[in-house]
Amino acid sequence: MQKNPNVKIFISIPPIDFPADWQQTAEDAGLNNIRELYEFFVNDHTHKTVIDQLREMYPSTVIFSIPTGWATFDLEEMHQNDLLLDDISLFGSFERAIFTDAKGHQGEVVVTTGALIWLSSIYGVHLRNNDFDTGFNTDLHTVAEE
């Protein structure tokens, strides 16, 4: 950054690993649910141990965090409540699932939503006015905005 002081840095904060164990993981941490754990992970852990330290080391550099994990939790919750307008399973192939494996690697619906989050965060695109066809019936633009 010393050679390119005008750079802006965007750091994505992914969801917690092993989605099948989210509730137990949250309870083991003394919290009620995965959303509470993620909020702690973003604000108290990632910001304090990584992002705030980078900002101190490079005060003239703009450093943003993008907690993309929220969209993953929203999509998982929509799946649990049968609110997705697509035939998407919780675990399965990249094209047809939220997660591709037990660790929680993301399927296409999550990756596409994440791309929209980046589009909005980095370029300031207003997603409700954006007509990019995600290939999904579920309104991923709205999920990405929330």
For each feature predicted by the language model, list its residue ranges:
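Alpha-helical cap/lid subdomain in secreted, periplasmic
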Residues: M1-E108
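Histidine-centered active-site loop/cap adjacent to the catalytic His
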Residues: L90-E146
